[in-house]
């Protein structure tokens, strides 16, 4: 444990040195192995280990505007890989929930898309003996299934499309905030705390170096919003195509 703590603390003093970041990756791996060696799996360590390994691949040197274009591209690519990996975990979780819901619907069962899905799952967890904290909204969720149902559908959408957001910097801070709020709600309803994941999402997305260094407008959010923005872009391209053909004598741009 001591060696892991020392290794993970080195980048705090020497973030520009790759050796320090390699030592941190090894330290995180050792800590993850230690905490997962007691008979249960702590999934929160998985993303941290991979992110630490990716950060070890960041180029050496301080982040400055005077760095070469190749250096800055290398830095941004490595950071984007770490972001995409974390979001891929959320997307896989959402897709599995949707796939299970479709299968349950086909079998005539109350699945992920049923209005009482979240309430039933919460009630099941409470019957399992979930420890109650000082604030617990589980009884309210069970008693108001139709109020929380739209929230659960929004949760499925946020999870399933997370990996798309990794490549849309304008949405980094918004999606990071939404994911953190989801984890907080899970804690207050099911007493399952994702503190490690909250910290990682905060570092990678709320503090994303790729996100615009300004306030993002609602129009920009709508144009970048997963599926919605893609549909708007497709409709815009469909509307502009006839105009382009008319301007070019009816000859599409691709045929010229």
Q: What are the roles of these predicted feature ranges?
A:
Residues 87, 91-157:
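Membrane-interfacial catalytic/cofactor-binding modules of polytopic membrane enzymes
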Residues 48-63, 86-89, 200-212:
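Hydrophobic cores of alpha-helical transmembrane segments in multi-pass inner/ER membrane proteins
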Residues 18, 36-46, 58-69:
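Transmembrane alpha-helix boundary signature
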Residues 33-46, 187-196:
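Membrane-interface helix caps and helix-loop-helix hairpins in membrane proteins
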